Amino acid sequence: MDTLSHKTLSSNKISADKKWFVVDAEGQNLGRFSSKIAKVLRGKYKTNFTPHADCGDNVVIINASKIVMTGNKLEKREIFSHTGYPGGQKRITPKEMLVKDGTSVVRHAIKGMLPKNKLGAAILKNCYIFSLEDHDKEAQKPTNLNLNDLI
């Protein structure tokens, strides 16, 4: 590469250098954890970050069912959804979500921190969440990621 060139290089889906990371969610605060994962998925910490392209990394999250929420948010917070029919508003607490599916609370938090468009949906597909410690992504050889090293 020409180091004296004054060109701005823009990354795209093909030229993006995607890595695989594994992150342990046990004992982590949900909001701080999710915002750091969203930055890694989006690729915002990379020098060749491009807002309109999927240039982020793939993340494997283990122990998602052991995530922590401060205070009594686990019982008091309500997450709303709507079926699309009149009177079809549904409410569920994070505690009920964890009982139903151990990964849904983390997935919901990360999804809320990504763009609300087709790119956000594509980026979320790079996140693999498992409620326990075992996962099926050993073939990709993911490296451990310490979230405290990220800003």
Residue spans for each PLM region:
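Residues that form or immediately flank small-molecule/cofactor binding pockets and catalytic motifs
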Residues: 27, 132-134
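Hydrophobic, well-ordered secondary-structure segments
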Residues: 106-107, 111, 124
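Ribosome large-subunit tunnel/peptidyl-transferase-proximal elements
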Residues: 1-108, 118, 141-151
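C-terminal structural segments of small proteins and small subunits
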Residues: 120-130
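Aromatic-residue detector
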Residues: 42, 129-130, 137
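Basic, amphipathic alpha-helical segments enriched in Lys/Arg and hydrophobic/aromatic residues
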Residues: 119, 135
